[in-house]
Regions:
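Helix N-cap/capping motif at the beta->alpha junctions
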Residues: 31-40, 61
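Alpha4 helix (beta4-alpha4-beta5 surface) of REC/receiver domains from two-component response regulators
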Residues: 62-63, 80-99, 106, 110
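Active-site residues of response regulator receiver
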Residues: 53
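Receiver (REC) domain active-site loop signature in two-component systems and cognate sites
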Residues: 56
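Charged docking surfaces used in two-component/phosphorelay signaling
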Residues: 16-24
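Hydrophobic/aromatic residues positioned on beta-strands within the core alpha/beta folds
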Residues: 76-78
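Receiver (REC) domain switch/output surface
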Residues: 108-119
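Conserved sequence signature across two-component system core domains
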Residues: 7-9, 32, 50
């Protein structure tokens, strides 16, 4: 069964690039452009993984992750993992990975596969 990934990023180029990369690798990808759009999409679909930008407009990321407890989340950010930890964003057990932008395409695909137990 095809896994579904929700990509949430306010940067259209990043959002669409990640979508294309993942679709080419066999995933069903849904996108959201900010925190509010993310929460709206989650009412419509339950993805297997959310790739979530840490810094974007709309509902703050800390509020989003409080509402999502049963879906794996991997952060995408230009900030360092230590900065995310300082903000308390890595405390939930469903936070499974952290991708620092810019990221390597093959690394992204490999790590998503590992997260979804496909590699």
């Amino acid at each position: 069964m095809t896994k579904t990934i929700l990509v949430v990023d306010d940067e259209p180029d990043i959002r669409e690039s990640v979508k294309l990369i993942l679709e080419v690798n066999g995933y069903n990808v849904i996108t959201a452009n900010d925190g509010d759009d993310c929460l709206k999409k989650l009412k419509e679909v339950k993805p297997n993984l959310i790739l979530l930008d840490i810094m974007m407009p709309g509902t703050p990321v800390d509020e989003i992750i409080k509402q999502i407890t049963n879906i794996k989340i991997a952060f995408m950010s230009v900030v360092r993992i230590s900065d995310a930890r300082k903000k308390g964003l890595c405390m939930q057990e469903n936070i499974v990975d952290f991708f620092q932008k810019p990221f390597n395409v093959s690394d992204l695909v490999d790590r998503v596969g590992l997260i979804l137990n496909e590699k």
